[in-house]
Amino acid sequence: METLIASLDDAPIIDKDGYEYLVHPISNGVPMLDPALLREVVVELMQTAELDVDKIVTPEAMGIHLSTALSLQTDIPLVVIRKRAYGLDGEVSLHQQTGYSESEMYINDVEAGDRVLVVDDLLSTGGTLAAICASLSDIGAEIADVVVVLRKVGPSALDDTEFEVTSLLDITVEDGEVLVH
């Protein structure tokens, strides 16, 4: 995890209406994502996540690069929860709300009885992951594990749910600095 921790030291922090926003290659795609960082994160995901699953499920957009690399390494099929409806048979709509946005997302190719691993880049407010996990449960999928690379320590929409999230690193952003816990 040395590369990931070092990358946090170099990550810009920008002010968005009084909110200290971490800009990081894993969670934003900028600054440029170094292959060594992606490799380290995927190896750690492979060692941390429950991989006895039928599918890896990830939300668009910043979970895609992580989950694609994980899928390539494990041969587990990948399902991307999209921000656009395609109108395919069995498509399920979900409403997600975070601390800074609100939108619809769409799940395809997950069916009752599927055992799934949910992977995402960052858990901040928990709105996206809470909505995804609730929708997957409503479909009848078994959520074997939920793993994120970074978790911002603090209250989350997942706190009062049955869903537990494992993170590779827990962080806070204070006074323009990232602190690893």
Swiss-Prot record:
Its EC number is 2.4.2.-. It holds the Pfam family Pribosyltran. One of its GO terms (biological process) is purine ribonucleoside salvage. Disulfide bonds: none annotated. PANTHER family: HYPOXANTHINE/GUANINE PHOSPHORIBOSYLTRANSFERASE, XANTHINE PHOSPHORIBOSYLTRANSFERASE. The keyword RNA-binding does not apply. This is HGPRTase-like protein 1. It comes from the Archaea. GO terms for molecular function: transferase activity. Signal peptide: none annotated. NCBIfam families: HPT_Archaea, PRK02304.1-4. May catalyze a purine salvage reaction, the substrate is unknown. Keywords: Purine salvage, Transferase. It is an enzyme of class 2 (transferase). InterPro entries: HGPRTase-like (IPR026597), PRibTrfase_dom (IPR000836), PRTase-like (IPR029057), Pur/Pyrimidine_PRTase (IPR050118). It comes from Halalkalicoccus jeotgali (strain DSM 18796 / CECT 7217 / JCM 14584 / KCTC 4019 / B3). The lineage of its organism: Archaea, Methanobacteriati, Methanobacteriota, Stenosarchaea group, Halobacteria. Belongs to the purine/pyrimidine phosphoribosyltransferase family. Archaeal HPRT subfamily.
